[in-house]
């Protein structure tokens, strides 16, 4: 895992198309701004896991 330190207003770039900017820090929360192409999905981890569970559930129902 790559670990980076950024300050408010600083940006990191992933590949050629994804920019992540630190917008603010309040206590233990960090606000991030993410610019990515429309074909790149961006989700919080808990939402992504829920989507994956729903896909697995749909796949298992179709297999029956």
Curated annotation (Swiss-Prot):
GO terms for molecular function: mRNA 5'-UTR binding. Keywords: Activator, Cytoplasm, Repressor, RNA-binding, Translation regulation. Gene3D superfamilies: Translational regulator CsrA. InterPro entries: CsrA (IPR003751), CsrA_sf (IPR036107). The keyword RNA-binding applies. It is found in: Cytoplasm. Homodimer; the beta-strands of each monomer intercalate to form a hydrophobic core, while the alpha-helices form wings that extend away from the core. This is Translational regulator CsrA. It comes from Legionella pneumophila (strain Corby). The lineage of its organism: Bacteria, Pseudomonadati, Pseudomonadota, Gammaproteobacteria, Legionellales. The gene is csrA.
């Amino acid at each position: 895992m790559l670990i980076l330190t950024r300050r408010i207003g600083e940006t990191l770039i992933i590949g050629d198309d994804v920019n992540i900017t630190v917008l603010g820090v309040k206590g233990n929360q960090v606000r991030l701004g993410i610019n990515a192409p429309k074909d790149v999905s961006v989700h919080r981890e808990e939402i992504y896991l829920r989507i994956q569970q729903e896909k697995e559930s749909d796949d298992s129902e179709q297999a029956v």
